[in-house]
From Swiss-Prot:
Residues 31-51 are annotated as: Required for interaction with TES. SMART domains: ACTIN. Interacts (via N-terminus) with TES (via LIM domain 2). Heterodimer with TES; the heterodimer interacts with ENAH to form a heterotrimer. Interacts with ACTL9. Interacts with CYLC1; the interaction may be relevant for proper acrosome attachment to the nuclear envelope. It comes from Homo sapiens (Human). Strongly expressed in testis. Also expressed in other tissues. GO terms for molecular function: structural constituent of cytoskeleton. GO terms for cellular component: acrosomal vesicle; cytoplasm; cytoskeleton; Golgi apparatus; male germ cell nucleus; motile cilium; nucleus; protein-containing complex. This is Actin-like protein 7A. Changing residue 245 to T: In SPGF86; uncertain significance.
Length: 435
């Protein structure tokens, strides 16, 4: 089974930010993480009706003969949905979570036209569409649209029958418990999956680093979290949530670009998103960066219509909102301040442990200079401690990678929730396996 370097003892540490000597990789302590790869995947229904060995439930006794298939890992975020088979190093499919819905005036009563356009379907239609996102700050608000996205992922992207594969799903920290019950209802009743499991995103991110304890700092597209985890268990009472993330950075950048004389509209947010990814960075010291001659910051960006625009100080000014949220009229703490606040709520021993295991993840942390700036801010705020920011090269897929590792471990296999268990005990059975 593949596993990232940090997930195997003896392979060396993850990359450290700063000048401190790197510590050895923390040994994986839990039994489930020591057991190695699974010798078999989840059982799924086969056409034969040969009886199985008796089990404790009547439903289990009546199950027909089964065969082995690979589990599927799905990470649904506000910006993108990633999926692929467990055991792979990275997701094989990634599509935007934003979908297209035909405008009401274009629909006629009784017509059977497509209601949701997903992925490449957005580019292959002449229908006038309204772009919508079924998530708000990481929380699902439109389950029907999520089902449409997953239908597209399973049938069109992965080209699999979901009724033949177990599915591991990621869930954001502090999400409502009803989220998990809705996931189970959708997977078991709409897709007829044979088994499923739901795991917290922060825990999966931590597993991608090969750790069992750490302070996960996740900056995604719609929301940011600072989550302390001890021996695999998140601590919700001291978890920090910030309702600003990558999408807010994009909106702020649009305003800066227009202040510089450009004329971008909300419909061109995709172009601004591309500018952010290709041209922007996080300054180690914004005051010193402003003293650099403008000519050294100026670069050209070619728009889709062939027109060129010049970018200058807005390249690094946009990312300052993470450390000074008042720039986007937010009253919440800056990311570095929230991180220190969470650490200070821990007892002395745990705080010392987490200080050396600050784990970055999420697409917005991929901005050049982000880890070094966060390291500098934390070191400045904690002069008597030794905060250490850790980074992985593909931390934008850390949640999915952690799920891929987890679903492949032999010790994890008893934690799948099977459809017959859901049918017999109801959705509350989830909480016996997913915690």
């Amino acid at each position: 089974m593949w596993a990232p370097p940090a997930a195997i003892m003896g392979d060396g540490p993850t990359k450290k930010v700063g000048n401190q000597a790197p510590l050895q990789t923390q040994a994986l302590q839990t039994a489930s993480l020591r057991d190695g790869p699974a010798k078999r995947a989840v059982w799924v229904r086969h056409t034969s009706s040969e009886p199985q060995e008796p089990t404790e439930s009547k439903a289990a006794k009546e199950r027909p003969k089964q065969e082995v298939t690979k589990a599927v890992v799905v990470d649904l975020g506000t910006g993108y949905c990633k999926c692929g088979f467990a055991g792979l190093p990275r997701p094989t499919h990634k599509i935007s979570t934003t979908v297209g819905k035909p405008y009401m005036e274009t629909a006629k009563t009784g017509d059977n036209r497509k209601e949701t356009f997903v992925g490449q379907e957005l580019n292959n239609t002449n229908v006038h569409l309204k772009l919508v996102n079924p998530l708000r700050h990481g929380i699902i608000v439109d389950w029907d649209t999520v089902q449409d996205i997953w239908e597209y992922l399973f049938r069109q992207e992965m080209k699999i029958a979901p009724e033949e594969h177990a599915v591991l799903v990621s869930d954001p920290p502090l999400s409502p418990h009803t989220n998990r019950e809705k996931y189970a209802e959708m997977l078991f009743e709409a897709f007829n999956t044979p088994a499923m499991h739901i795991a917290y995103q922060s825990r999966l991110s931590m597993y991608s680093y090969g750790r069992t304890s750490g302070l996960v700092v996740e900056v995604g597209h719609g929301v940011s979290y600072v989550v302390p985890i001890y021996e695999g268990y998140p601590l919700p009472s001291i978890t920090g949530r910030l309702d600003y993330a990558g999408s807010d950075l994009t909106a702020y950048l649009l305003g800066l670009l227009n202040s510089a004389g450009n004329e971008f509209t909300q419909d061109q947010m995709g172009i601004v998103e591309d500018i952010k990814k290709k041209c922007c960075f996080v300054a180690l010291d914004p005051i010193e960066e402003k003293k650099v001659p403008l000519s050294e910051h100026t670069i050209r960006y070619v728009l889709p219509d062939g027109k060129e625009i010049q970018l200058c100080q807005e390249r690094f000014l946009c990312s300052e909102m993470f450390f000074k949220p008042s720039l986007i009229k937010s009253m919440q703490l800056g990311l570095h301040t929230q991180t220190v606040s969470c650490l200070n709520k821990c007892d002395i021993a745990l705080k010392r442990d987490l200080m050396g295991n600050i784990l970055l993840c999420g697409g917005s942390t991929m901005l050049s200079g982000f880890p070094n700036r966060l390291q500098k801010e934390l070191s400045s705020m904690c002069p008597n401690d030794t905060p250490q920011v850790n980074v992985l090269p593909e931390r934008d897929s850390a949640v999915w990678t952690g799920g891929s590792i987890l679903a492949s471990l032999q010790g994890f296999q008893p934690l799948w929730v099977h459809r017959f268990e859901y049918e017999e005990h109801g959705p509350f059975f989830l909480y016996r396996r997913c915690f």
